[in-house]
Amino acid sequence: LDSYGTVLATPFNMAHTQPEMNALVSRLKEFDEPVTILLEYTGHYHYPVLKKLQDEGFPVCVVNPYQMKKYGDVEIHKAKTDKKDALRIATYALEKSYKLVPYSFMEQKYEDLKFLSRQYDQRIAFVAKLKVQLINLLDQTMPGITKFLALKSRNPEKSALMLFIKRYKSFDEIQRMGKTRFLSTYATLMKKTTDRHAPQKGLAIYELARDSITTRGEDPYIWSAQDQCVDLLAAAQNAADEIITQMQNIAETIPEYKVLRAMNGVGDRLGPVILAEIGDIRRFHSAKALNSFAGNDAPPYQSGQFESRNRHISKRGSSALRKACFEVMQALKLTKPQDDPVYQFILKKEQEGKPYNVAKMAGVNKFLRIYYARAMELYR
């Protein structure tokens, strides 16, 4: 569209290849007016177009898909096609040109951190899924075993339950071994684990195995499935640990990471994740903007004489950042650092009668405000 809203070119398809992108660039350079380009966030699929056009010197802006959805809600007769979406985005760019800001990539280390954070989330999600699958299998071969040996995937080579599954397969196998032989082999096996309490549970586990009824305890196919789950779980956890180590190495080169790690509740895992989700702190003009980015803001609602005093957070922001910060609040509640302002703020909100999780999210708000103030001091 030109500045008068006239359609200069009807929507057309274009592959993300050099020949077709070069043809688009040539066409854009033919226009007499300055060109403003607006793209919609589409995962990582818009990055080739964004990179190519920026390299050619065009100002490229990027809009959130939710904004475009709400912008299209004003239409009475709604229609959803790629061609109509293209015209809708162009109209939005023309109408909102006064507030569009060209997209700029963060420093490479921030981009790398964010990429690794997404990979870490995927590995951890896979770990959680494998744990559910493994417990489902254990309900058929070793019902109740997790009451004595918890399923912990950290340091899988020394996990008591994972070693136990690999060695004994099912309760039927334990019954065949007999009490004396089982207790002897169990004591030897538990020397490989870091669980301090596991060695004392041998007799209780044997009694559980003796009294339990298994449904597929002698099935070699379920034994194979269990072993595969254990191996996959160990591999996924090791992959997640490797990624978090890479994130720690990058984070240590960023000045504000020391500020973040010095805050109570932030450890070697949550620190890099929070830093990855926030990115460069200098891109936020205020602590309020940082909370809004996290979706932890509560927009005002007022109409006439009515003014709401019981508002909910918007959740229009990074859910990964909210989750990581919420885990920091959980750590504060466990460790109870009496001199920590965030912990004291959570206690204050709880004493005011706020629900448990509402008080924690209020703590997240204060946590991000404190972090913003301390981190920005490094760049002043």
Predicted regions and their residues:
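A detector of single, family-specific signature residues
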Residues: 1-380
